[in-house]
UniProtKB/Swiss-Prot annotation:
Its cofactor is Mn(2+); Mg(2+). It comes from Bacillus pumilus (strain SAFR-032). GO terms for cellular component: cytoplasm; ribonuclease H2 complex. Residues 70-254 form the RNase H type-2 domain. A divalent metal cation binds at D76, E77, D168. Manganese or magnesium. Binds 1 divalent metal ion per monomer in the absence of substrate. May bind a second metal ion after substrate binding. It is found in: Cytoplasm. This is Ribonuclease HII. Its main location: cytoplasm. The gene is rnhB.
Length: 254
């Protein structure tokens, strides 16, 4: 009879071979051995659920491919709501065999997971484009148009020319077939990847602004209107990266 340690090692080695694992412990009555099997079953079920969820996240990409499109980009932005800093968009073209289990709406991910997916997407994606629109331009053309402009710039930064765009609740002035999806970052793998890249890119920019303007602590709130942020504006006035057209900033500095 194998020791529990040996069983654990064999389960890890043959984790995909269900019949082997059941045969391994079918006559083993030890609680410790049975617990290992229970753990394996739970992990296997979790992996199956993650694979099913990933397949579901590819439905829009697969539908586009079924219509004959071959280069599909998912686009999303980060930073529409903050009082300071740019709005950042990312366009991501995934390879056909890319698998990013667990990727979902980037706002629901912990910072640690988001950074891990960011690194994975950078490594696994066929192409990534980033578009940035600064606070002064946001004040000039409004945040909706600035978000659209950031998305257009992101597409223009791609080395590959997409023939189909999946966009989170937006239509872009581009001569490319496009589909806009409400809450797309929770429904489309490509959009979710774009959302993750945009969010991390913007967060990194805000951390740098935090070093440039330490009195505002941008690295903590990323430009959102927290109580501490509003108090800092009240004390120090607006920084060069504040959106002066946004009501909370306007009311504090007027």
């Amino acid at each position: 009879m194998y020791t529990v340690k040996q069983i654990k090692e064999l389960i890890e080695k043959h984790s995909q071979d269900e019949s082997y694992i059941h045969e391994l412990v079918k006559d083993d009555k030890r609680k410790s051995a049975q617990k290992l099997i229970e753990k394996w079953h739970k992990e296997r079920e979790k992996q199956q659920q993650l694979h099913a969820a990933w397949h579901e996240m590819l439905q829009f990409e697969n539908n586009a491919k079924a219509q004959g499109y071959t280069c599909i980009a998912g686009i999303d932005e980060a930073g529409r709501g903050p009082l300071a800093g740019p709005v950042v968009a990312a366009a991501v073209i995934l390879k056909d065999d890319t698998v990013l289990l667990g990727l979902n709406d980037s706002k629901q991910l912990s910072e640690k997971k988001r950074l891990a997916y960011y690194d994975l997407i950078q490594k696994e994606a066929l192409d990534i484009g980033i578009g940035i629109v600064d606070a002064a331009t946001i004040d000039e053309i409004n945040i909706y148009e600035a978000s659209r402009l950031a998305m257009v710039r992101a597409v223009e930064q791609l080395a590959h020319t997409p023939d189909y765009l999946l966009i989170d609740a937006m239509t872009l002035p581009l001569p490319i077939h496009q589909e806009n999806i409400i809450k797309g970052d929770a429904k489309s793998a490509s959009i979710a990847a774009g959302a993750c890249i945009a969010k991390v890119t913007r967060d990194q920019m805000m951390e740098e602004y935090g070093r440039q303007y330490p009195e505002y602590q941008f690295e903590k709130h990323k430009g959102y209107g927290t109580k501490e942020h509003l108090a800092a504006i009240q004390t120090h006035g607006a920084a060069p990266i504040h959106r002066l057209s946004f009501a909370p900033v306007k009311s504090v500095i007027s």
